[in-house]
């Protein structure tokens, strides 16, 4: 089963995370037409990268906003719209959760350090070999898709530790979505659409743990949902 992964600079861990649960990878980039991009894939993985343009959610640009790629935004907005129209499974990671939320009608905190009073450090700058270093705790909401996927790996307090490399976050949650995890400072760590086959966005980087498997259930869940697409009569 092929999973479409949006092109980004650091794609290898995403690729490995999908392949290690038995999936095949197809890299999607803005040079593709929409028909070609989605042809033959059973699910979509939205990857990390630069900031989403604030113009997408009707706000002036904060001075901290960096690496905006209008072409990528345009491509991913079209991907998200078509994937949701088809009810293709979606897993959105870091920038991906932000793109998913904004494309579906939500907004973002443009800069956590200056816009979230009392915020934890979320934008850890680490060398490649430390991308799996755990940064802070998060709490999962009960009876959500995320909690069900991670249930066997959670502590008794329904919490787990995650890595963290972001300065933006979901602010207003898109209509139809719900929060499924938060950091102790209230920053949203995951959202999902309970009406979809599988539509989950996470703010941390679970793909960095493909060797050790802490977040393997997220990728297994995506692949299982993608396989159900092809079995649909």
Which residues make up each language-model segment?
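Residue-level marker for buried hydrophobic side chains located in beta-strands
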Residues: 200-202
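N-terminal beta1-alpha1 cap of cysteine-dependent amidohydrolase-like domains
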Residues: 1-91, 101-109, 113-161, 167, ...
